[in-house]
Regions:
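Juxtamembrane membrane-interface segments at transmembrane alpha-helix termini
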Residues: 14-24, 36-48, 135-146, 166-172
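Hydrophobic alpha-helical bundle architecture
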Residues: 110-123, 136-183
Length: 183
């Protein structure tokens, strides 16, 4: 039911209240996501530990990869980068996270489909992902004890979701290929 509320907010407030298709100043999906994060912070940021789907799910939750990274960088006791799921687990979605951001493989399949159908071009997703890869690679090279590898950066969190599905929104993204690369 939370997803339905998010969709109603995204379409009703994020899109239609501004005049409908082509008139909205914000990405409606992102507006819906922000609405849900503000309205239901616990439900949007707490996930059952993988393999722990029992009647006691609320008591057995796992930290997300982003929560682990944040804890390590801030010096939280008992947190280590070794607590992160493997790159393969991040790829297939065997970790906690928000709806739409846990399985990098599913997101990449969505990207391939949209490129194949010519719904989007490669410019925006590739420029965003390449930029993050380069800068996170520099940080990892500087201090690999507190910064994760660029591959883990790409596979964890909402980066791919944003780069593939949100940044490519027709209304709120550039139209020229040069603009898309800079964006």
């Amino acid at each position: 039911w939370i997803i339905i509320l998010g969709a109603l907010f995204a379409i009703g407030v994020g899109k239609m209240s501004f005049g409908g298709l082509g008139c909205n100043p914000f990405n409606p999906a992102l507006a819906g996501r922000v609405f849900l994060l503000l309205s239901f912070p616990v439900q949007m940021t707490t996930w059952p530990a993988v393999g722990q789907l029992t009647a006691y799910t609320d008591a057995t939750t796992a930290a997300t990869p982003l929560a682990i990274m944040k804890g390590v960088i801030s010096g939280a006791p008992g947190m280590s980068l070794s607590d992160l799921p493997s790159s393969f687990s991040l790829l297939i979605g065997n970790n906690g996270g928000c709806l739409g951001e846990v399985s990098a493989l599913a997101l990449l399949l969505g990207l391939a489909y949209m490129l194949w159908k010519k719904i989007i071009t490669w410019h925006i997703p590739v420029s965003i992902l390449a930029t993050v890869f380069v800068f996170s690679g520099i940080m990892y090279w500087v201090n690999p004890e507190i910064y994760v590898s660029p591959v883990v950066q790409l596979l964890s969190g909402g980066l791919m979701l944003g780069a593939i599905f949100m940044a490519t929104d027709y209304v709120t993204s550039p139209m020229s290929h040069k603009g898309m690369l800079i964006y």
